[in-house]
Design a protein with these regions (language model features):
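Hydrophobic alpha-helical segments at protein termini of multi-pass membrane proteins
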Residues: 1-230
Length: 230
């Protein structure tokens, strides 16, 4: 029997939001020279969270359309990447505050972490409702170390595409944006597909790959910081 207690809700919210705020603090340091306005970062984060209840019925619709796993995962990935981009764009990317290449990556990662915070809260809440605190802690650890990083990486791929085309003409910017979306969607879908169809050792390898990509993202940030108008 499910018991929706105040303690379960508080633990799920803290478990979902606090770790993502730690990651947010970590990534915002990459933009330490010219930080974005706090109000726009907060808006991007909140809009990212608000995207989750929009994504859920859309993903349920996709799941009812087909039973082919890889198609479902790609459908879900498209929905989530588009919604995270919309959240980041509405939050700060459309404003004059986005005045340098790195800003798109910051806003997209912020929105992605907002999305991850709400999503993680729901996943952690499920076992807590049955009193299974251990499973809730395991879920928190897995999502902190894997799924949250995936959201960061996929949104950062789109942000990097925007960054590298920041000083280009509109046609080139659109082309880069499309390529960024394709990369993000493929990365997101393949991770979800493999993580659910791989044995424990394979899952470990996948998580190691995610961490290697995170290191690559740190190096990419340094490259983006050096982008200048030609």
């Amino acid at each position: 029997m499910f018991t929706l207690s105040p303690l379960s809700i508080i633990l799920a919210v803290l478990g979902g939001i606090v770790p993502t705020l730690v990651w947010l603090w970590f990534w915002l340091r990459e933009d330490g020279a010219h930080p974005e306005p706090n109000r726009l970062l907060l808006l991007s984060f909140v809009l990212g969270m608000a995207a989750v209840p929009v994504a859920i019925p859309l993903e349920q619709f996709i799941a009812h359309l087909t039973a082919i796993p890889i198609v479902v995962f790609f459908g879900w990935s498209i929905i989530e990447e588009v919604l995270k981009y919309v959240a980041a764009y509405a939050g700060g990317m459309h404003t004059q505050a986005e005045d340098e290449p790195i800003d798109a990556m910051i806003y997209l990662i912020t929105a992605a972490l907002g999305f991850a915070a709400a999503e993680n809260t729901l996943f952690i809440l499920q076992p807590l409702l049955t009193g299974d605190i251990f499973t809730g802690l395991v879920t928190l650890n897995i999502r902190f170390m894997g799924t949250t990083l995936l959201h960061i990486l996929s949104s950062a791929a789109i942000g990097a595409a925007v960054a590298f085309s920041f000083y280009k003409n509109q046609r080139v910017r659109h082309e880069f944006l499309v390529m960024g979306f394709v990369l993000a969607i493929v990365l997101h879908a393949l991770f979800n597909f493999l993580i659910l169809r791989t044995e424990s050792m394979g899952v470990f390898v996948i998580f190691v790959c995610i961490w290697v990509l995170i290191i690559g993202l740190l190096l990419l940030f340094e490259r983006v910081k050096r982008i200048q108008r030609a």
